[in-house]
């Protein structure tokens, strides 16, 4: 049995994300538990490190887009926001 992922983030960035997008990083971390979640690479924002985008449902039943990178054994959250209507359709149709 594998250990659950460990999450990390910068406090000021988490506060700014909450103010701008009304999504806490604590909620964003729960999206990683969505079995229907979709992860894609984010080459446009991957200068210096590989970044990824996760589209999935949180424990509050909100569909979120979470940007993250892997740092050692941890998942480093960069930002999180509510999915757009287009992203909602992609998720529902299994295209993300």
Task: State where each predicted segment sits.
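Ribonuclease/tRNase effector modules and their secretory precursors
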Residues: 1-96
């Amino acid at each position: 049995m594998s250990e659950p992922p460990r999450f990390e983030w910068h406090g000021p960035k988490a506060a700014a994300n909450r103010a701008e997008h009304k999504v806490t990083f604590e909620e964003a971390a729960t999206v990683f538990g969505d079995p229907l979640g979709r992860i894609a690479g984010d080459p446009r924002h991957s200068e210096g490190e590989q970044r990824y985008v996760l589209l999935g449902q949180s424990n509050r039943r909100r569909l979120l887009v979470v940007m993250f990178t892997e740092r050692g054994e941890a998942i480093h959250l960069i930002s999180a926001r509510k999915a757009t209507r287009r992203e909602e359709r992609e998720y529902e149709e299994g295209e993300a």
